[in-house]
Regions:
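Acidic, surface-exposed loops and disordered segments
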Residues: 1-169
Length: 169
């Protein structure tokens, strides 16, 4: 089961397609996910922020794949404690235990994992239609992170400026 779910997990997006993760097996069910320091890109990701985002995408793909197999992925984030935000810790990002659980349902997103690709084309400068934004908002059910849309050009520019400044910090 671990190999099957990892086949989907490794399709997660990563900075410059570096796939900066390392996986180890412990016991029969545990997967230990860590950042592979040999794959970091200090020039454009000095504190590993993008590597950690990539690890999160890896875990999401793993979770979706586990559900498709009738397993629950019990994910323990930063089991050694939360890392210092200014460095890339050597401690594991997560311990994942795969538990057979026939009550879990296959998420329809699972079927899209192999379809994901990097779009390197220039973005169109059109706004997300209100109807599409409403459909996305209605389908979103992860309460820890808010989802919202804006057609306010000043707000969009302000958020874009903050994102650019975040790369300098």
């Amino acid at each position: 089961i671990r190999i099957r779910v990892l086949n989907s997990a490794i399709l997660a997006p990563s900075p410059h397609n570096t796939q900066p993760w390392r996986v180890a097996f412990r016991g029969e069910e545990r997967i230990v996910l860590s950042i592979d320091h040999t794959r970091l890109i200090p020039g454009c990701d000095p504190i590993g922020r993008q590597a950690f985002i990539s690890a999160g995408a890896f875990l999401e793909n793993l979770d979706l794949a586990a559900k498709s197999e009738g397993f629950r992925a019990d994910i323990d984030l930063f089991p050694g404690g939360w890392p210092d935000a200014r460095t890339v810790a050597k401690d594991p990002v997560a311990h994942v235990d795969l538990i057979e659980d026939r009550r879990v349902d296959c998420d329809p997103l699972f079927l899209n994992i192999p379809l994901r690709h990097t779009n390197r084309r220039r973005f169109e400068e059109k706004k997300v239609p209100l109807e599409a934004a409403g459909e996305l908002t209605a389908a979103y059910d992860f309460s820890l992170v808010p989802l919202g849309f804006s057609h306010d050009d000043d707000l969009i520019r302000s958020v874009a400026d903050l994102a650019a400044k975040a790369m300098e910090i």
